[in-house]
């Protein structure tokens, strides 16, 4: 596979362009998304001629007009992954609100927040059945993927290796676990298992994130209990 993109396409100019409108008219198109289909189909043909298949972001299959030879990366939302698998596309499930590890983990921490603010507990909570994936759709799920985009890495000099570890661990551990065997045992059981790995990660030099302590207030006194 070669990933050819297709996300966040601004179709404003296509709607204004006389040449684009003429092309749509000649081909009986009414939706500008079909122009993206046309472009992607040409890309797919070039790849096929060289023995490759296209990987695309989920927006590229909005109309369902692309060949099912495409591999879809479902980043926008769980719904986008549901739509792609329902249309028969093999899909890498990676919705940002669960698996974009450049998202901040609490409102007070560093990172982006456009997709969600979440920690490893939310990652572990992802469940295909609860999200509505049918057995047929599950046959189109290639796997789960976590993502960390490079601009969030290079902007953190000089601490960027430590920052990458902090943002990815232990969220990536939770992702690996649910991709392997789901989350049927529940968070509390998994959390005990996860903390057993802390010494191992520390010995490996991984600068992982600890869960913040729990703070409560009652009758004029604060109580702080460590989560880790």
Where would I find each of the regions flagged by the language model?
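Aromatic/hydrophobic beta-strand junction motif of beta-rich domains
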Residues: 222-227
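Flexible, acidic glycine-rich loops studded with aromatic residues
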Residues: 53-62, 66-70, 74-220
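Active-site neighborhood of glycoside hydrolase catalytic domains
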Residues: 1-70, 75-87
């Amino acid at each position: 596979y070669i990933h050819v993109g297709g996300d966040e396409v601004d179709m404003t100019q296509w709607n204004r362009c006389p040449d684009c409108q003429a092309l749509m008219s000649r081909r009986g198109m009414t939706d500008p998304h079909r122009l993206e289909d046309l472009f992607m189909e040409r890309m797919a043909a070039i790849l096929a001629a060289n023995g490759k298949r296209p990987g695309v972001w989920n927006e590229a299959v909005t109309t369902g007009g692309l060949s099912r030879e495409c591999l879809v990366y479902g980043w926008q939302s769980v719904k986008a992954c549901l739509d792609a698998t329902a249309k028969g596309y093999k899909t890498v499930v990676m919705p940002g609100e669960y698996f974009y590890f450049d998202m901040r983990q609490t409102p007070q921490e560093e990172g982006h927040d456009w997709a969600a603010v979440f920690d490893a507990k939310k990652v572990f909570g992802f469940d295909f059945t609860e999200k509505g994936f049918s057995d047929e759709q599950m046959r189109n799920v290639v796997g789960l993927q976590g993502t960390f985009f490079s601009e969030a890495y290079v902007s953190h000099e000089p601490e960027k290796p430590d920052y990458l570890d902090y943002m990815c661990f232990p969220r990536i551990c939770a992702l690996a676990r649910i991709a392997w065997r789901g989350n049927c045992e529940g968070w509390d059981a998994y959390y005990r298992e996860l903390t057993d790995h802390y010494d191992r990660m520390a010995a490996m030099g991984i600068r992982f994130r600890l869960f913040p302590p729990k703070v409560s207030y009652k009758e004029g006194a604060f109580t702080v209990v460590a989560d880790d």
